[in-house]
Swiss-Prot record:
GO terms, molecular function: ATP binding; pantoate-beta-alanine ligase activity
Binding residues annotated for beta-alanine, in chain numbering: 73
Biochemical pathway: Cofactor biosynthesis; (R)-pantothenate biosynthesis; (R)-pantothenate from (R)-pantoate and beta-alanine: step 1/1
Gene Ontology CC: cytosol
Enzyme class: ligase
Primary role: Catalyzes the condensation of pantoate with beta-alanine in an ATP-dependent reaction via a pantoyl-adenylate intermediate.
Residues binding ATP, per UniProt: 42-49, 159-162, 188, 196-199
The family this protein is said to belong to: Belongs to the pantothenate synthetase family.
Annotated localization: Cytoplasm
Keywords: ATP-binding, Cytoplasm, Ligase, Nucleotide-binding, Pantothenate biosynthesis
Protein name in UniProt: Pantothenate synthetase
Species of origin: Rhodococcus jostii (strain RHA1)
Superkingdom to which the source organism belongs: Bacteria
Additional record remark: The reaction proceeds by a bi uni uni bi ping pong mechanism.
Length: 312
């Protein structure tokens, strides 16, 4: 228990900056039988992040939220310097949510020798988002791998909005034998369907209105799923084409593992587009050729989802 001295206080938020200290605290908690859950973020927290926290807390775990704007996952011309940083407000939100541990490192503490060792994402990392952001996923997987090592959690939570990211993290955890469960949480949306994102704050009123075309297109495509992948895409394209402010990068139907779309079965419809200078992504599950998502037949309650995690 000595490793918990000053590093963890039940019911209070303790903020850690030193990776080695957080590792000691997490392992000490696990050593006395506590579950530890990690919610990695880049800050600028919103309701979507807090839903990840809520899901993590359902299991009774001690929740660690990391806040780190990772320079490795920003490419040339991307918005590293402009990315919103709202640490004081973020920590207050975590206190209100009942989070007990926050990890707020710097680039110097995360990469003391520079980014000399990185994780290669494999072929999937060069597709979809990887076409326009060729270095993004290597940077993302590298920081996630480090956070999993540092926080030493039983389970880590990621949003389904970044579906390719979630898929690659699951791939990495499987391929590299990480001893951690990865739990995907459904996308949280505004009342008008816009997926919550820290980048939404870059949109002016007109752009924000135009951006709702992404979710509208996805929903329309999902409703056309009984006609197969081509019907899904044709329907979604029609919606996007009706809003000229939306500059589409890609719109694709894939399998749930982001392999080729099935002729019949569960898949994923993914879109990326620019609205003004802001790049947005979104996705939904689609029942290709059937119009009925198998996984949505009986949505689990919060309690059953928590029970499922604890039983694994």
């Amino acid at each position: 228990m000595s490793d918990l001295q000053g590093g963890y206080k039940r019911g209070e938020l303790t903020v850690h900056h030193d990776p080695s200290v957080l590792t000691r605290v997490s392992k000490a908690l696990r050593g006395v039988g506590r579950q530890v859950a990690l919610v990695p973020t880049m800050g600028a927290l919103h309701t979507g992040h807090l839903e990840l926290v809520r899901q993590a807390k359902l299991t009774g775990a001690v929740v660690i939220v990391s806040i780190f704007v990772n320079p490795l996952q920003f490419g040339a011309g991307e918005d590293l310097d402009a990315y919103p940083r709202t640490l004081d407000a973020d920590l207050e939100l975590l206190r209100e949510a009942g989070v007990e541990l926050a990890f707020v490192p710097t680039a110097a503490t995360m990469y003391p020798a520079g980014p000399r060792t990185t994780i290669h994402p494999g072929p999937l990392g060069a597709e979809l988002e990887g076409v326009s952001r060729p270095t993004h996923f290597a940077g993302m997987l590298t920081v996630v791998a480090k956070l999993l090592q540092i926080a030493a959690p039983n389970v880590a939570y990621f949003g389904e909005k970044d579906y390719q990211q979630l898929t690659l993290i699951r791939q990495m955890v499987t391929d590299l034998n990480f001893d951690v469960r990865i739990f995907g949480v459904p996308t949280v949306r505004e009342h008008d369907g816009l997926a919550l994102s820290s980048r939404n704050r870059y949109l002016d009123e007109a752009q924000r209105s135009a951006a709702t075309a992404l979710s509208a297109a996805l929903i329309a495509g999902a409703h056309a799923a009984a006609g197969g992948a081509e019907a899904i895409l044709a329907t979604a394209r029609e919606v996007l084409a009706s809003v000229p402010e939306v500059e589409v990068d890609y719109l694709e139907v894939r399998g749930v593992d982001l392999g080729p779309a099935p002729e019949r079965g569960d898949g994923r419809l993914l879109v990326a587009a620019k609205v003004g200078t802001t790049r947005l992504i979104d996705n939904v599950g689609v029942a290709v050729g059937t119009g009925f998502l198998e996984r949505d037949a009986e949505p689990p309650s919060d309690a059953s989802a928590a029970d499922e995690l604890l039983s694994r």
